[in-house]
Structure formats: structure tokens, C-alpha cells
Amino acid sequence: MFPMVTEFMNYGQQTVRAARYIGQGFMITLSHANRLPVTIQYPYEKLITSERFRGRIHFEFDKCIACEVCVRVCPIDLPVVDWKLETDIRKKRLLNYSIDFGICIFCGNCVEYCPTNCLSMTEEYELSTYDRHELNYNQIALGRLPMSVIDDYTIRTIFNLPEIKT
């Protein structure tokens, strides 16, 4: 008869332990109920990007001296720089500059090492297209000023996200 009593005691202890575990999980679930949702309705709401965000590269044609430092520091040798040597003035003249954003890894080395600061990162991150060949930007497309999210009146910008507490 004693083994039956000990089995009931073990069963009771296991039941209490299971109820405690379920209660702990339920309390964690309830603690998340008072937090704000993290979901952002993307096309209508956008986050303000940070100051050091690595978006589309902006290129200023007039500042470039065709030194090709950007090509040397790029881990995938991506920027294509075409230039012609002007023998009378002994300087390089830039003819064409292009970057294929379908291949670019947005590491920012070209921007960081450019001696004339003709390259800069923008806050523009919407680069999706239906054809991958449209992602090959020449100097005209790279020179286009980025559209600021803050200036667009049709989009509600979200400045502060609720911090996720762990």
C-alpha cells in the first residue's frame, strides 16, 4: 500500500510542477501585452534611418579625379571608372563612372577611402526593380539627389521605435 501512496505523491508533485511551468509561461506572455507593437505598415510608415546608414551611393562627377582608389578598396572591384589622360595638362579626365547595385555589398569602403569625398552614402534603400540590369547606375543616376523620407508628405515617419526589453 505504501508504493501506491508514494506514486500519488509523485503524481501530485509533478502536477504542481507542470502547473508552475505553465503559469510562468503565461506570465511571460502577459508581460508582453502592455508593450507597443513593433510592426510598421511599410509603404505608409517608414523608419527614419540612422546618420551612418549605408544606403544608395551618391556620386559627384565634378569632384572625382579618377584616382581609382574606390576600385582598389572595393572587395569585389565593383566601380567601373573610365578615364582619359589629357597629355597637355597632365591630368586624368573622367569619362564614365558606374556601380552595379545588384552586386554591391554596401560595405562603404569606397566612400571611406575616397580622397575627394565625391562618394557618399544616402538614406535611400528602396532599390528594387523588376530587371537586374536597371540596378547598374551610371554617373547620371548616381548623381541624382536622394529623395528624403522626411520631406515626403504622403508617408508617416516613425522616429522612435519602442525598445525591445529582453
UniProtKB/Swiss-Prot annotation:
It catalyses: a plastoquinone + NADH + (n+1) H(+)(in) = a plastoquinol + NAD(+) + n H(+)(out); a plastoquinone + NADPH + (n+1) H(+)(in) = a plastoquinol + NADP(+) + n H(+)(out). One of its GO terms (biological process) is photosynthesis, light reaction. It is a peripheral membrane protein. Its cofactor is [4Fe-4S] cluster. It holds the Pfam family Fer4. [4Fe-4S] cluster 1 binds at C64, C67, C70, C114. Its main location: plastid. Its EC number is 7.1.1.-. One of its GO terms (molecular function) is 4 iron, 4 sulfur cluster binding. Keywords: 4Fe-4S, Chloroplast, Iron, Iron-sulfur, Membrane, Metal-binding, NAD, NADP, Plastid, Plastoquinone, Quinone, Repeat, Thylakoid, Translocase. [4Fe-4S] cluster 2 binds at C74, C104, C107, C110. The keyword Translocase applies. Residues 55-84, 95-124 form the 4Fe-4S ferredoxin-type domain. Binds 2 [4Fe-4S] clusters per subunit. It is found in: Plastid, Chloroplast thylakoid membrane. The keyword Chloroplast applies. InterPro entries: 4Fe4S_Fe-S-bd, 4Fe4S_Fe_S_CS, NADH_quinone_OxRdtase_chainI, NDHI. It comes from the Eukaryota. GO terms for cellular component: chloroplast thylakoid membrane. HAMAP family: NDH1_NuoI. PANTHER family: NAD(P)H-QUINONE OXIDOREDUCTASE SUBUNIT I, CHLOROPLASTIC. NDH shuttles electrons from NAD(P)H:plastoquinone, via FMN and iron-sulfur (Fe-S) centers, to quinones in the photosynthetic chain and possibly in a chloroplast respiratory chain. The immediate electron acceptor for the enzyme in this species is believed to be plastoquinone. Couples the redox reaction to proton translocation, and thus conserves the redox energy in a proton gradient. NDH is composed of at least 16 different subunits, 5 of which are encoded in the nucleus. Belongs to the complex I 23 kDa subunit family. This is NAD(P)H-quinone oxidoreductase subunit I, chloroplastic. It comes from Lactuca sativa (Garden lettuce).
